[in-house]
């Protein structure tokens, strides 16, 4: 049985473990599609995507169409004659004409247990909503948004200390085996498809920077989830006077508070206790504008005074 001719489409780091596995598998990785280089950083220099960097390092041809609205981009893909297209966080919508090019269709590695958390930010939403588990789903793509039939699922627990960053890394690594299993099933014509139950579907919309501001009138547990869901981006923040204070790490406590939500109750070597709508939140790692991430203990030892008991965080 011959290996499959695979075209990969992806942009961020999430797809790299699968790319590493693909190139070592019996399948033939013929080309990589990724988004065009974008200006990034203070200098606004054009930056290649992690997937493009990987492809160049492994001498795999790279294609970067702006979209697939023009026939030339569609014909270019068609000329590669792929058996299957593997799509992981590509960030471009694939029209029906593209989905029909590969002999075995396009399969997508999605970072949730579908039909829960269809959409752009499944990892963040799993943490925001306190899900006990997350996982990856390999599905056959159709013209809907993450609505296609499922080929394989793999689950993992979401811990109380997981951030979007740590869960991202776990899911990226654990997606390798399900993807390879699905490719083998497709190659041997033994793949089994399960339709999604649309009644159970939830939607994970794109996360915006504007959502990162902490609302101290929420519960300590809800704020803790937000801080973890928005780490490493866009990072939850509050205002200490006129200063933006980013909060990188915190945890809900069982310390009841009757003070106004947002009031700093205490600062010591263990962290900064802040009142919420119920129990206090213990803030452990912070960042002031233009400064490095620092523990509250180290900030306390620095002798600085921007934060103090009784200050209202907004």
Swiss-Prot record:
CDD domains reported for this sequence: FMT_core_Met-tRNA-FMT_N, Met_tRNA_FMT_C
SUPFAM superfamilies: FMT C-terminal domain-like, Formyltransferase
Enzyme class, first EC level, given as a word: transferase
Pfam families: Formyl_trans_C, Formyl_trans_N
Alphabetically ordered keywords of this record: Protein biosynthesis, Transferase
InterPro entries: Fmt, Formyl_trans_C, Formyl_transf_N, Formyl_transf_N_sf, Formyl_transferase-like_C_sf, GART_AS, Met-tRNA-FMT_C, Met-tRNA-FMT_N
Top-rank taxon: Bacteria
Catalytic activity: L-methionyl-tRNA(fMet) + (6R)-10-formyltetrahydrofolate = N-formyl-L-methionyl-tRNA(fMet) + (6S)-5,6,7,8-tetrahydrofolate + H(+)
GO molecular function: methionyl-tRNA formyltransferase activity
GO cellular component, one term: cytosol
Gene3D superfamilies recorded: 3.40.50.12230
EC number(s) on file: 2.1.2.9
Residue positions binding (6S)-5,6,7,8-tetrahydrofolate: 112-115
PROSITE patterns to which the protein is assigned, alphabetical: GART
Function: Attaches a formyl group to the free amino group of methionyl-tRNA(fMet). The formyl group appears to play a dual role in the initiator identity of N-formylmethionyl-tRNA by promoting its recognition by IF2 and preventing the misappropriation of this tRNA by the elongation apparatus.
NCBIfam families in alphabetical order: fmt (TIGR00460)
PANTHER family according to UniProt: METHIONYL-TRNA FORMYLTRANSFERASE, METHIONYL-TRNA FORMYLTRANSFERASE, MITOCHONDRIAL
Stated family: Belongs to the Fmt family.
Identification of the protein by name: Methionyl-tRNA formyltransferase
Lineage: Bacteria, Pseudomonadati, Pseudomonadota, Gammaproteobacteria, Legionellales
């Amino acid at each position: 049985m011959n290996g499959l001719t695979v075209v990969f489409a992806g942009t961020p780091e999430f797809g790299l473990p699968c790319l590493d596995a693909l190139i070592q598998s019996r399948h033939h990785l013929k080309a990589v599609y990724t988004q065009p280089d974008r200006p990034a950083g203070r200098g606004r220099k054009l930056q290649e995507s992690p997937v493009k960097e990987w492809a160049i390092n492994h001498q795999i041809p790279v294609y970067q169409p702006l979209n697939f609205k023009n026939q030339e981009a569609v014909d270019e893909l068609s000329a590669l004659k792929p058996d299957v297209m593997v799509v992981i966080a590509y960030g471009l919508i694939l029209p029906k004409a593209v989905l029909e090019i590969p002999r075995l269709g396009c399969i997508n590695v999605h970072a949730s247990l579908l039909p829960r958390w269809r959409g752009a930010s499944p990892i963040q939403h799993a943490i925001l909503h306190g899900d006990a588990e997350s996982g990856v789903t390999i599905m056959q793509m159709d013209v809907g948004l993450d609505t296609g039939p499922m080929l394989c699922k793999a689950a993992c627990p979401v811990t109380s200390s997981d951030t979007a960053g740590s869960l991202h890394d776990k899911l990226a690594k654990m997606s390798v085996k399900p993807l390879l299993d699905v490719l083998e099933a497709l190659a041997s014509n033994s793949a089994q498809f399960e339709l999604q139950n649309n009644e159970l579907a939830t939607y994970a919309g794109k996360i915006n920077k504007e959502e990162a501001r902490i609302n101290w009138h929420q519960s300590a547990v809800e704020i803790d989830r937000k801080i973890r869901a928005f780490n490493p981006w866009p990072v939850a923040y509050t205002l200490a006077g006129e200063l933006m204070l980013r909060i990188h790490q915190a945890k809900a406590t069982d310390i009841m508070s009757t003070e106004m939500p947002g009031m700093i109750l205490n600062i010591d070597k263990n962290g900064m206790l802040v009142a919420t709508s119920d129990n206090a939140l213990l803030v452990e790692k912070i960042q002031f504008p233009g400064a490095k991430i620092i523990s509250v203990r180290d900030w306390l030892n620095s002798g600085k005074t921007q934060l103090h008991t009784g200050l209202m965080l907004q």
